[in-house]
UniProtKB/Swiss-Prot annotation:
Its EC number is 2.1.1.14. This is 5-methyltetrahydropteroyltriglutamate--homocysteine methyltransferase. Disulfide bonds: none annotated. It catalyses: 5-methyltetrahydropteroyltri-L-glutamate + L-homocysteine = tetrahydropteroyltri-L-glutamate + L-methionine. L-homocysteine binds at I440, G441, S442, E493, D608. Catalyzes the transfer of a methyl group from 5-methyltetrahydrofolate to homocysteine resulting in methionine formation. The gene is metE.
């Protein structure tokens, strides 16, 4: 039998027990002993459910109180000085949570801002970025891994501790203070890995999993050389070592990975099935090969028959050296499909969450040597039925959608006239002042808004009562904006729970789970919608709300939509058609909404593409294809309107230099971006490229409750005006105001409007 193992399991619990315990601990409602007890219960339950599913070698070290990279930072003593409490012997859970969430000014060690958080490769999980200093010292400072190994072994489990590898850990971090090469720290860090491996050996461990996902990236030669040096040094340490790669193919790093002096290599055959034959040919004859055949980051059942073809071939070549696993950690998958008691039976039969994926791995491993076992035959028969159902279901395949896709012409993804002609007509029709002021779309989601939405879903409010409650919120938002003197208004999005879910609920081809939660970071869990079939819009989604808002004012009201790429990136996508096809289907649905908004008298429509840059592939050579279809999808949804209708887009991230040409190719009339935290430095990209359209650089950070002064905003706008012609500048916050409270929102917008008026005065005076 091939060995069945997993690279990691979701830590949040079937009912988000970890989230609830974390938040209770932060509020002081649960003490540390209570929090630790919840952690122990979750780990025990997760090991047992994997074992019951047929997993033979269980991961330990995949549990984290907040984030696995942060756990490693504590383990290695990489704790910034601002979080070191004087007199404490070592880090505590309070240290860990302080690094993740920041520390208030009235705490024992004074105020300290949280560490930076960023995306874990191309997933929707976020990690805490390690902060390295040039004189960084490493020392073993956190016992969690060793305690959990003892815990699992005491329960009778065969374990495989999981470590983030030394090169990946350094790659994920940032140099703070003086600039230096993070690779300079490698020789200081490696002795800690030696200590850890020796201690694990002393605990009776046989195998350790060392995650090096940066092997699927474009690595500089110095980092490739460092891999060889590091693993040659670690070769003398005890334990069998499995280097795990995932999220892509090894490509030019294949030879490097295959020849590292370790005992096994895990490869992702879901993201990069084409690397399989080369790996077998290049790998030394003593090494274990772990095949990632079950998708660890989506919700669809595995095509067991197709996967079994690979397993059989690998078994012939590898014999006992074959292991079977998910493609990556199951952290990115919901926990257990059995919790879903309200899902349509046919749709549910197509899905697999983490527990079900463990069973699929176990079946494939067993099928390698026992192809006629009753359990294997039954699973294969069920899998065949599922694949046949998905291939032929009219719920998935919609002839009308496919015919419309086939009929798309190049001109459908082009505005009728060039920007210079459009903007002249728009300026004449909109009659806005210089430095026009607006917001990004959402206003504070108050407790009364959330209660009304919840009551409506529970049937406690009638539809008429709910509409009136939302109309009341819209009236309030419009009234405040008029009082503040904003130039382009929004309706405030009171009716929207989430910028993707709100639209997905109204599109055919999406389904929603009740318990399909995955961790985004810390206690923040998200429940992505699932795209199961061809996508279309049966009816207008936003028109009545925006039409009502426009009826309340003579000022310009802006329609607010989520773009096709963001809808796709923040959903669980289909696997039977490409992301490009799904983006086009979404673009057509959104296009219909844009056209309907124009017909309702709305003269500005904003189409948010918050996830546009997130969709970039990990390898640069794959960027051009992605950027081509992503920009085309945006233009397709935005190009059904007249020249007089102004299209805005919003992007909230902090790196534009490498995609600026593609952003220009989207051809939005106005782009609003997040720039305040960079002190407008991001605008260099737009200046150097000579970005042709209009720009609204964010003038204050909405992630902080702090109210910026008029003088601060004026200074930022003057800095922006040195880079972007004044006639092309808009004035707006960085992002939506959903998470802020009304008092700070109004105070900040008062200063923003005053700053815009001061700039207009400057302009008039020449």
């Amino acid at each position: 039998m091939a060995l069945a193992h997993t690279l990691g399991f979701p830590r949040i619990g079937r009912d988000r027990e970890l989230k609830k315990a974390q938040e209770a601990f932060w509020k002081g409602e649960l003490d540390e002993a209570g929090l630790r007890a919840v952690g122990r219960q979750l780990r025990a339950a997760h090991w047992q459910v994997q074992k019951d599913a047929g997993i033979q070698l269980l991961p330990v070290g995949d549990f984290a109180w907040y984030d696995q990279v942060l756990t490693h930072s504590l383990t290695f003593g990489v704790i910034p000085e601002r979080f070191r409490a004087h007199g404490e012997a070592g880090p505590t859970l309070h240290t860990l949570f302080g690094m993740a969430r920041g520390v208030s000014d009235d705490s024992c060690c004074g105020g300290a801002h949280a560490q930076e958080m960023t995306k874990w490769f191309d997933t929707n999980y976020h990690y805490l970025v390690p902060e390295f200093s040039a004189d960084q010292q490493f020392q073993l400072s956190w016992e969690q891994l060793f305690e959990e190994v003892d815990e699992a072994r005491a329960l009778g489990h065969q374990v495989k501790p999981v470590l983030i590898g030394p090169l990946t850990y350094l790659w994920l971090g940032k140099a703070k203070g003086a600039e230096f090469d993070r690779l300079d720290l490698l020789d200081r860090l490696l002795p800690l890995y030696g200590q850890i491996l020796r201690r694990l050996a002393g605990q009776g461990v046989e195998w350790v999993q060392i995650d090096e996902p940066i092997l699927v990236l474009d690595l500089p030669q110095a980092w490739k050389n460092a891999f060889e040096r590091a693993y040659n040094l670690l070769q003398s340490e005890p334990l069998k070592k499995l280097v795990a790669t995932y999220f892509g193919g090894l490509e030019d790093n294949l030879g490097l990975a295959a020849n590292l002096p370790v005992d096994g290599l895990h490869i992702d055959l879901v993201r990069a099935p084409e690397q399989y034959p080369s790996i077998l040919d290049r790998l030394p004859a003593y090494k274990v090969v772990s095949l990632g055949l079950v998708n660890g980051r989506n919700v669809w059942r595995c095509d067991l028959e197709k996967a079994l073809e690979v397993v059989r071939h690998a078994r012939e070549r590898l014999g006992e050296r074959l292991w079977v696993a998910p493609s990556c950690s199951l952290l990115h998958s919901p926990v257990d499909l059995e919790r879903e008691d309200g899902l349509d039976a046919e749709l549910k039969s197509w899905l697999a969450f983490a527990v079900q994926k463990c069973r699929e791995v176990a079946v494939l491993a067993r099928a390698a040597t026992e192809p006629e076992a009753a359990e294997v035959l039954a699973a294969l028969e069920e899998s065949r039925a599922v694949q046949a159902s998905r291939a032929s279901s009219p719920r998935i395949h919609k002839p009308a959608v496919q015919a419309r896709l086939a009929a798309i012409k190049a001109s459908d993804a082009q505005r009728r006239s060039p920007f210079a002609e459009r903007i002249a007509r728009q300026r004449a029709g909109l009659d806005l002042p210089a430095f026009p002021t607006t917001t990004i779309g959402s206003f504070p989601q108050t407790s009364s808004i959330r209660l009304a939405r919840q009551s409506f879903k529970q049937g406690k409010l009638s539809e008429a009562e709910y509409i009136e409650a939302m109309h009341s919120e819209i009236r309030h938002a419009v009234q405040i904006q008029e009082q503040l003197g904003l130039d382009v208004l929004v309706h405030g999005e009171a009716e929207r729970n989430d910028m993707v879910e709100y639209f997905a609920e109204q599109l055919d081809g999406y389904v929603f789970t009740r318990f399909g939660w995955v961790q985004s970071y810390g206690s923040r869990c998200v429940k992505p919608a699932v795209i199961y079939g061809d996508l279309s819009r049966p009816r207008a989604m936003t028109v009545e709300w925006i039409r009502y808002a426009q009826s309340l004012t003579d000022k310009v009201m802006k329609g607010m939509l989520t773009g096709p790429v963001t809808m796709l990136m923040w959903s669980f996508p289909r696997e039977d058609v490409s992301r490009e096809v799904q983006a086009r289907q979404l673009a057509l649905a959104i296009r219909d909404e844009v056209v309907d908004l124009e017909a309702a008298g709305i003269r500005i429509v904003q189409i948010d593409e918050a996830a546009f840059r997130e969709g970039l592939p990990l390898r640069r050579n794959a960027w051009p294809h992605y950027l081509e279809w992503a920009t085309e999808a945006f233009r397709l949804c935005a190009s059904g309107v007249r020249d007089e209708t102004q299209i805005h887009t919003h992007m909230c991230y902090s790196e534009f230099n490498d995609v600026i040409e593609s952003i220009a190719a989207m051809d939005a009339d106005v782009i609003t971006i997040e720039t305040s935290r960079s002190d407008m430095e991001l605008l260099e990209a737009f200046e150097q490229f000579d970005y042709p359209n209009e720009i609204g650089p964010g003038v204050y950070d909405i992630h902080s409750p702090r109210v910026p002064s008029r003088e601060e905003i004026v200074a930022l706008l003057r800095k922006a005006a040195r880079r972007i012609p004044a006639e092309r500048l808009w004035v707006n916050p960085d992002c939506g105001l959903k998470t802020r409270a009304w008092p700070e929102t109004e105070a900040a917008l008062v200063n923003m409007v005053a700053a815009a008026r001061e700039l207009r005065g400057d302009l008039a005076r020449g």
